[in-house]
């Protein structure tokens, strides 16, 4: 079967926004107008098509990027194929947004007309900048009290540092919003609000004529800057035709020079069809964006893969999901070549082969089996064994590793334990499945406490994962409070001379050791023997080292593992009959316990390297707050229109920080933190910790 739609007629795009900007409603409208949905699902009914996990329907927020294929007849009457990826708008799920953006060619940024550019919009916009994704902006909820299109346009410049290019103006606002002025055609488009009704095309209202002229002039001035010939013609007094103007806007949008801005209200069905036309006219086809880069596995040199069916097959797995009916599904974007059911592909990241069994085209939560797919397609593959997010699948004869995605390290950890014995095994399986789906979620076992520790991007992130474990895997578990891993060390040298004697009929036990314990700069334990002349026979020396190592795991202050200790065996004595390896082990153990006390034991705590990216207005508050958390500020620098604050802060003082930072900066600041080093705990704090763990 040949390709049904030319690759030039594909549009792979996502809708990105702050939570509550109306993204799910907008996607629903798009699916309705493009003919895939018969009844529109409203988010506040919990009946939305794209939000298909139970938690999403309950909470009314989108957690998982669902990929949907649909079709639209553009202004020219030609049918185009849309692959839409829905993305979450909550800070804890930015990993989902990041991996969606990685496989998109373009995006629509949705703004709430009342709030304008909100914190999460800034975060997502920054991620889109990183991948150089062409974007349009749709100012939604124009019917809302306080809706202000012009303020939203201004904020795109001031908050996002982007060039705004309005291609429409609103007619009326709040309850009086009826339609838009099309600045390219210079016509008014109005809707009566009935579902699916086409726009009525008319003349621009007289009271808006001057404003429309002013904005059209600005539009043309920005658009002609993209092309030298158009610029020269314009300066000589020749205006571009409407089609030429569209072509210039398309070029500038794809080159990320500016961002077309449209407006409407998805909920009231006004402005949706012109937005779909704009997707066709301004957002790129897979062939309009640069060919994807990768590393040729055979030559280890950089290579590219063109968006063409003739090129060798290459695709990127960008998401893994557990589907209640099909099991594990791997979503992949085909960048080049043609994929046929039943072929074997190379996973070049894992070095393993994968057979493509079942291939599905997804429509939110319904699915259609397909036998082949082409460059530009987004497909769901069932039953892959080895592939995880970010892996490349390709033609085994032309192996390539496509650019990988970067995933942030988790910032919060909690201990979790199953409620019953029966839950124990199921919990292990559930956690492994969830970790395979979500690269920002990690699972590990704490060697010291034996507990299972889960780590993620925030409190909501972990809440939802524990909740999913309960619903999808029927595992009941208790989650604990976040914990800090302290350590202990010594501050000075101490020499210990210890004799172990035990006489209890028959042969006894005897061992004498003389050891110097001292601190050293590393984190590891160093053992050295300086025995000369056989005061301790060679065969007993390993017993001395083993004895010390066996008690290093629990320090004298609060039972935490010890770091940075050097032990030097300098002398000792033995008995021909009563000495043994075990006797020397016992003697060195007791010597270490005594030595750790004498050598000035101290508590150490993990210090985190913290980076906060904040708008300038909140820098003072952020620095003050970090100081109050015993933080040391190491510097600030400008990054675009934001400020970066770098600091070293004890982990114990960072719990709950994400919520404090959100409220302090109205959600506009972000932070990352990673472990840097251990440092002595201040005396007052150390006493509290010792009491707690004694």
UniProtKB/Swiss-Prot annotation:
GO biological process: ribosome disassembly
GO cellular component, one term: cytoplasm
Any one GO molecular function term: GTP binding
Cross-referenced InterPro entries: EFG_II (IPR041095), EFG_III (IPR009022), EFG_III/V (IPR035647), EFG_IV (IPR047872), EFG_V (IPR035649), EFG_V-like (IPR000640), EFTu-like_2 (IPR004161), G_TR_CS (IPR031157)
PROSITE patterns: G_TR_1, G_TR_2
Record's keyword annotation contains Transport: no
Ranges for domain tr-type G: 8-287
HAMAP family for this protein: EF_G_EF_2_B
Job of this protein: Catalyzes the GTP-dependent ribosomal translocation step during translation elongation. During this step, the ribosome changes from the pre-translocational (PRE) to the post-translocational (POST) state as the newly formed A-site-bound peptidyl-tRNA and P-site-bound deacylated tRNA move to the P and E sites, respectively. Catalyzes the coordinated movement of the two tRNA molecules, the mRNA and conformational changes in the ribosome.
Protein's name in the database: Elongation factor G
Organism: Brucella suis (strain ATCC 23445 / NCTC 10510)
Underlying gene: fusA
């Amino acid at each position: 079967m040949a390709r049904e739609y030319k690759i030039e007629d594909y549009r792979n795009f996502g809708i990105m926004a702050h939570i509550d900007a109306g993204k799910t409603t907008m996607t629903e409208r798009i699916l309705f107008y493009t003919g895939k949905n018969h009844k529109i699902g409203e988010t506040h009914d919990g009946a939305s098509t794209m939000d298909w996990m139970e938690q999403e329907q309950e909470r009314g927020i989108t957690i998982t990027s669902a990929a949907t294929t649909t079709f639209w007849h553009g202004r020219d009457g030609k049918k185009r194929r849309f692959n839409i990826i829905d993305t979450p708008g909550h800070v804890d799920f930015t990993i989902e947004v990041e991996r969606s953006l990685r496989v998109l060619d373009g995006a629509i940024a949705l703004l709430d007309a009342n709030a304008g550019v909100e914190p999460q919009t800034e975060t997502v916009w920054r991620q889109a900048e990183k991948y150089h994704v062409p974007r349009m902006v749709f100012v939604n909820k124009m019917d809302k009290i306080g809706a202000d299109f012009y303020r939203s346009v201004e904020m795109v410049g001031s908050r996002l540092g982007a060039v705004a290019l309005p291609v429409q103006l609103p007619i009326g606002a709040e309850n009086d919003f009826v339609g838009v002025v099309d600045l390219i055609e210079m016509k008014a488009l109005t809707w009566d609000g009935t579902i699916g009704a086409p726009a009525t095309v008319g003349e621009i209202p007289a009271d808006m004529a001057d404003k429309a002229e002013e904005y059209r002039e600005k539009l043309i001035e920005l658009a002609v800057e993209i092309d030298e010939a158009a610029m020269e013609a314009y300066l000589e007094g020749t205006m571009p035709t409407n089609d030429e103007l569209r072509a210039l806007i398309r070029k500038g949008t794809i080159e990320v020079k500016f961002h077309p801005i449209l407006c409407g209200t998805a909920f009231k069905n006004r402005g949706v069809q012109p937005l779909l036309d704009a997707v066709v006219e301004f957002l790129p086809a897979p062939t309009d964006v640069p060919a994807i880069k990768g590393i040729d596995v055979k030559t280890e040199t950089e290579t590219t893969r063109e968006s063409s069916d003739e090129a060798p097959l290459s695709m990127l797995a960008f998401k893994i999901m557990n589907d209640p009916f099909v099991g594990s599904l791997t979503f992949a974007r085909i960048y080049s070549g043609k994929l046929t059911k039943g072929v074997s592909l190379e996973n070049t990241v894992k070095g393993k082969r994968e057979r493509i069994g079942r291939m599905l085209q997804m429509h939110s939560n319904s699915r259609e089996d397909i036998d082949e797919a082409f460059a530009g397609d987004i497909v769901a593959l069932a039953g892959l064994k080895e592939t995880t997010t970010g892996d490349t699948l390709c033609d085994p004869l032309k192996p390539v590793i496509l650019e990988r995605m970067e995933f942030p390290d988790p910032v919060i950890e909690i201990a979790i334990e199953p409620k019953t014995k029966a839950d124990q095994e199921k919990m292990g399986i559930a956690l492994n499945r969830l970790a395979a789906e979500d690269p920002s979620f990690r699972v590990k076992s704490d060697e010291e406490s034996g507990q299972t520790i889960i780590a993620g991007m925030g409190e909501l992130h972990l809440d939802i994962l524990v909740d999913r474990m309960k619903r999808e895997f029927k595992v009941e578990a208790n989650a604990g409070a976040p914990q800090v891993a302290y350590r202990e060390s010594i501050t000075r040298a101490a020499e210990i001379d210890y004799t172990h004697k035990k006489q209890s009929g028959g042969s006894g036990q005897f061992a004498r050791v003389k050891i110097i314990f001292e601190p050293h700069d590393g984190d590891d334990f160093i053992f050295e023997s300086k025995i000369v002349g056989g005061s301790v026979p060679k065969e007993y020396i390993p017993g001395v080292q083993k004895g010390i190592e066996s008690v290093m795991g629990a320090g004298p202050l609060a039972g935490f593992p010890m770091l940075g200790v050097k032990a030097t065996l300098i002398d000792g004595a033995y008995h021909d009959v009563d000495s043994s390896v075990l006797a020397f082990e016992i003697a060195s153990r007791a010597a270490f316990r005594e030595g750790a006390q004498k050598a000035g034991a101290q508590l150490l705590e993990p210090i985190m390297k913290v980076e906060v990216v904040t708008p300038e207005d909140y820098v003072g508050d952020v620095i003050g707050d970090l100081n109050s958390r015993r933080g040391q500020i190491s510097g600030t620098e400008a990054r675009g229109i934001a400020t970066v604050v770098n600091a070293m802060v004890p982990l114990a003082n960072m719990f709950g920080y994400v919520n404090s930072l959100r409220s302090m900066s109205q959600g506009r600041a972000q932070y990352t933190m990673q472990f840097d080093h251990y440092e002595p705990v201040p005396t007052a704090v150390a006493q509290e910790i010792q009491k707690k763990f004694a």
